[in-house]
Amino acid sequence: MPLGTPTPTLIHQGPGWLYLNVCAPASGKRHVIGSDGTPAEPAWSASQAVTAGQMIIDANGNIQECTTGGTTGSTAPNVWGSTVGTATADGANVVWTCAALGPAYLFAGALEGVTDLDIGAKVEETTADQETLPIDAVMTGEVDSIAVTLKESDCGKLQLLVPHGTYASGSDSALPAGAQAYEEIAFGGLKPVPKYGVLLISKRKDQTLKFVISQIYRAYQKETVKLPFQRGKETTYKVTFQAIADENRPVGDRGGKVYRQT
């Protein structure tokens, strides 16, 4: 065969756009991205075949996951489950389960530096005393994650990034006039850890209407959120979204996916 030639179009270089609390596509499908890079937000539709693991945004803005596949009904459910883990019947046999509460498709905002997609298998070697090299290798675990440094620290975003936080917003008449509107994150006490999908979209340098898309179907934010306040530099903080298995999906597609539009 001839000597290989490097292909510049296969070398990726480009910034990322990060979205939090997103839907997972049906297994074998890909998250749809518009020509401008905007992710599609799937909604319920009538008389459609759905499979376990597929997600939609319901009429209340919460994310529902199909846990029993089939064909959706001719009309949408009157009431959607609005507590994580609550099931909703749809048509003759489809069951949706509330997977995450809104806001859905929250844009993470400005990023600093590198955004890392880590796809890692834990491999253990099998050895034999008769051999100096391992005689086999077996996968025993998996660690997949997306890590990034964020710059925008409004509480609307922090509600998805502080696992034990509770978000609220409103108006407080005790505050000074002109500064009575507020948003806050309260923390302290045992509560369930939010788990949701994370989507990273990066534009190709050679094809401005095509993208590389990385997604983790279900993740939790594992880092301590450290918010430095100083005069000389803007506040930044690092977050890591650690994948967990979505057991409603088939083996081989339970963690996430990366695909490149060609």
What are these regions (language model features)?
Residues E124, Q130-E131, L150-E152, K157, ...:
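Short acidic, glycine/tyrosine-flanked loop/strand segments centered on an H-E-D-like triad
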Residues I135-L158, G232-N248:
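Oligomerization/assembly interface segments of phage tail-like spikes and tubes
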Residues P134-D136, K203, K226-F229:
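Beta-strand-rich interaction surfaces with strong enrichment in secreted/lumenal proteins
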Residues T38-G102:
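Tryptophan-rich substrate-binding surfaces of secreted polymer-degrading and adhesive proteins
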Residues G156-Q215:
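Short helix-loop boundary/capping segments
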Residues V212-T262:
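Mixed-charge, glycine-accented linear interaction segment located at domain edges/termini
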Residues M1-P39, A100-A108, T262:
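Polar/acidic, low-complexity leader/linker segments enriched in S/T/G and N/D
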Residues A100-E142, A147-T149:
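A glycine-rich, hydrophobic loop/mini-helix early in the fold
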